[in-house]
Amino acid sequence: MTSLTLPDIAAQKHQHATPLAWVGMCGIALPVHFDGRSVAAMADAGVSLEDGSSRGIHMSRLYLSLERLERQSLTPLAIRQILADFLASHEGLSHAAYLRLTFDHLLKRPALVSPLAGWKSYSITVDAKIENGMFHVELSVRVPYSSTCPCSAALARQLIQQQFQADFSGQAINREAVLEWLGSSHGIVATPHSQRSLAEVNVRLGDRLEVLPVTELIDRIEASLGTAVQTAVKRADEQAFALANGQNLMFCEDAARRLHQALQQMDWAKAFKLRVEHAESLHAHDAVAASQWQW
């Protein structure tokens, strides 16, 4: 059998010399080591194609470079090395390299009061690039929380006041009777509406970080809002959650401002943008607010 050289179509010159901003692959399944364990990630990998006369890039070289994340932890340095490999394998063709990783980060969260605990999953995206010789990394997280409408709470309190006035008008106030009334559905005739809400935060990381501060960012977001959704609970935890919601009444504007102030205190953040979405239980539409700093 005659030995033939395999054709390399990508190396051929193209008659239409048009540079391309991004060429690569999306949706690559990849195990990565993060926070002491292996997680299933999806990767988008690409480079620019400045040499417009070149037919294409060498996608297999990008794919093989990603194997580094199977052997070492996912850190800014590891990501930078992969992007450098992308460029080295496309010398003369590309001046910019890009990598996006998405995965779910699991954290075991304690209940508010009881000794119970359970796992929560947070959607994480890491966007990195080398452009004009500069390395940039952005970290995005999606954090669910509960929000209770301040207006609805005020209206509910007014209805309770009216019911109290109707039930006790012209009577001598008896402490035990009032306590019983307060604990009954006849007394508490209205409750404010609340909903599961979502905070989406994107942070541009500083240049000298040795780790990706995923858990720290999630903790700061949940602490600033005060109403993180729960996992395993007993009745005491559910009561504590009701108290937390009552003490943290929030319009979407309030939530966005809380997050903005909290994120500005992170010295490792060069810039950020955020978006909060309250999936209204009163309306068929969502209430949304957004903010950004140095973005």
Curated annotation (Swiss-Prot):
Protein family per UniProt: Belongs to the GTP cyclohydrolase IV family.
Keyword terms: Hydrolase
Pfam families in the record: GCHY-1 (PF02649)
GO biological process assignments: tetrahydrofolate biosynthetic process
EC code(s) of this entry: 3.5.4.16
GO molecular function annotation: GTP cyclohydrolase I activity
Organism classification: Bacteria, Pseudomonadati, Pseudomonadota, Gammaproteobacteria, Pseudomonadales
Protein name: GTP cyclohydrolase FolE2
InterPro entries hit by this protein: GTP_cyclohydrolase_FolE2 (IPR022838), GTP_cyclohydrolase_FolE2/MptA (IPR003801)
The protein's role, per its UniProt record: Converts GTP to 7,8-dihydroneopterin triphosphate.
Residues flagged as site, May be catalytically important: C149
Class of enzymatic activity (EC top level): hydrolase
Catalytic activity of the protein: GTP + H2O = 7,8-dihydroneopterin 3'-triphosphate + formate + H(+)
Family matches, as PANTHER family: GTP CYCLOHYDROLASE MPTA
Pathways per UniProt: Cofactor biosynthesis; 7,8-dihydroneopterin triphosphate biosynthesis; 7,8-dihydroneopterin triphosphate from GTP: step 1/1
Disulfide bonds, paired cysteine numbers: none
